[in-house]
Amino acid sequence: MPFAAVDIQDDCGSPDVPQANPKRSKEEEEDRGDKNDHVKKRKKAKKDYQPNYFLSIPITNKKITTGIKVLQNSILQQDKRLTKAMVGDGSFHITLLVMQLLNEDEVNIGTDALLELKPFVEEILEGKHLALPFQGIGTFQGQVGFVKLADGDHVSALLEIAETAKRTFREKGILAGESRTFKPHLTFMKLSKAPMLRKKGVRKIEPGLYEQFIDHRFGEELLYQIDLCSMLKKKQSNGYYHCESSIVIGEKDRREPEDAELVRLSKRLVENAVLKAVQQYLEETQNKKQPGEGNSTKAEEGDRNGDGSDNNRK
């Protein structure tokens, strides 16, 4: 853990510095100097901690995303100045953990940590799906607007997953997490996206803008995927963040319905093919019989006509 690597005294004030021993060898002094440099770098790293990556739970339920778009449009109808403050399509997510990854090697370590996280998450969920229901609107000091995660047992499970993720990444030596308490939320707008708003007199998100959605139920999202995303790299064409790696939660359970659907589809295709073949066979059989049937009919008509002629002659 990166914070544990710093001596505990560094967090509690300056430690007592032992007096230099004049008999200490030059090599020992150099080793001590290297260790002090290492501690200073660690302290500087903590001070300069600027998260640039995060773990994301993507929100893909159309009911939720459509509801958020309706909410955003409702707000913009009341105040068009907020257009640039809105979170774009495809970017809706829950931030599970933030972290700092400074180079490609650290990104690779982060990818490994995410892979190690998967069995821990599945153990927490005990083979069950985690449904995340969203209801109502909230803000962070009037600066960030978000859809609330409804109360329930799912919150405890998500908090445990977030804490496990933080521990897993820190044990890999990654600076991760925040000092503030983790509060899962689904951001739909933030004023920091549009700094010019302050000059236009917009200093906070007014509650009246979203009052009709204050208790609105947006829907449920199943936790099925966790992504390691970049805050700074160019977003994907669908609007979602640049993704370094992903894990799928309960992958086996999610694939079974797909396999079952494929089986059902295959059966329907086979049944349709058989039915079509039978119909084609019957049509061909009828076509072969039709010429003979036609001659017989004509003969019968001829006999009837002949009988009629004889009768006339009589």
Curated annotation (Swiss-Prot):
Binding site for AMP: T95, H185, L186, T187
Tissues where this protein is expressed: Expressed in oocytes.
Any GO molecular function: protein kinase A regulatory subunit binding
InterPro entries documented for this protein: AKAP7-like_phosphoesterase, AKAP7_isoform_gamma, AKAP7_RI-RII-bd_dom, Cyclic_Pdiesterase
Keywords associated with the record: Cytoplasm, Nucleotide-binding, Nucleus
Region described as Disordered: 1-46, 281-314
One Pfam short name: AKAP7_NLS
Cell location: Nucleus; Cytoplasm
Segments for region (RII-binding): 262-275
UniProt feature, compositional bias: Basic and acidic residues: 24-37, 298-314
Gene3D superfamilies: Cyclic phosphodiesterase
Location of region: RI-alpha-binding: 261-285
Binding site for CMP: T95, H185, L186, T187
Keyword Nucleus: yes
Effect of K41E: Abolishes nuclear localization
Region (PKA-RII-alpha subunit binding domain): 260-314
Source taxon at top rank: Eukaryota
Main location: nucleus
Subunit structure comment from the entry: Binds cAMP-dependent protein kinase (PKA). Interacts with PRKCA; only the cytoplasmic form is capable of interacting with PRKCA.
Functional note: Probably targets cAMP-dependent protein kinase (PKA) to the cellular membrane or cytoskeletal structures. The membrane-associated form reduces epithelial sodium channel (ENaC) activity, whereas the free cytoplasmic form may negatively regulate ENaC channel feedback inhibition by intracellular sodium.
Protein's name according to its UniProt entry: A-kinase anchor protein 7 isoform gamma
Originating organism: Mus musculus
Classification of source organism: Eukaryota, Metazoa, Chordata, Craniata, Vertebrata
